[in-house]
Amino acid sequence: LPSMRNPSAEEVSRMRLVTQAFEADRIELHLQPVVSLPHTKIRFYEALARLRLADGTLLGPGEFLPLLEASGRASDFDRRVLIRSMAIARHLVARGSEAIVGVNLTAHSIAEPGFLWSLAGLLDTSPDLLGKIVLEMPQHSWRHLDADHRAALAILRERGVPFSLDRATDLRFDPVALADLGIRFMKLPADLMIEAAEQADGRYAGPELDVRDFASALRRQGIRLIAERVDEGDMVPVLCDLGVPLAQGFVFAGPRPVKPEVAGEPMAPQPFGLEDAPTLLRRAG
């Protein structure tokens, strides 16, 4: 058996700082747009969480999520992010925007017994937002659903909550099976799709499905394809040629902070408001 090592003083300090920031509710949301192709009109915002330490340092998920997971706080974190995202969605609705908000759920939380059921109760408190919040789950989680997960997802689906598959590591999927689960958006890495398109027959996802047919095969099942991590300009025309309807990445706009009063956050320095977002994001695109 591998030996257990004691955490270093630096690791203990980082855990303490992250825990303090979380308990002080210093979670901040940034929004990154998902745009239509080829016209780059904003259709969707993905809510991306950050955690601000007491000294002002802003941490990305890769820096704090493993620590929250290790301390059993991941599901509480996801619920807080969802509540903030619901506030953002309500703000968008009040402004007459048709954009929806995607909320990432961690694999750790999804695996926790009762977590998905708790989301149904949370979303039931705001029936006016049904259809405006998309729950995003990683590919790995979708591939390892147990009976309880499926039952909870069925309840959410019946309430009109759309789902998205993201954090894909390959291009293999069954459009019919995804639709049966209630998935309405599917995020695939732009570089993997482009790499597959450069092959002789494009048959990356299986013997019957060519990457050039991804968008149409998904559309027939009511699923919209999103190319993610579109970070280079020369990717865009290739994705357009593949018929990809939606895309996300730094070539259009990076994540930008939301005003704290919109998301119900503690005050943070130099945020921008959703009323500014369309201008800023379209300029970036």
Question: Where on the chain are the PLM-derived regions?
Answer:
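EAL-family c-di-GMP phosphodiesterase catalytic domain
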Residues: 1-10, 37, 51, 107-109, ...
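Short, basic/aromatic recognition patches
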Residues: 2-33
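A short, well-structured catalytic beta-strand-centered motif of the EAL phosphodiesterase domain
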Residues: 28-66, 184-186
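Short acidic-capped amphipathic helix/loop micro-motif used as an active-site/signal-coupling element
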Residues: 53-58, 82-86, 167, 249
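Structural preference for long, well-ordered alpha-helical segments in enzyme cores
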Residues: 68, 81-88, 119, 152, ...
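Catalytic core of bacterial c-di-GMP phosphodiesterases, primarily the EAL and HD-GYP domains
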Residues: 73-148, 229
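Catalytic-core regions built around general acid/base machinery
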Residues: 119-125, 151-159, 213-217
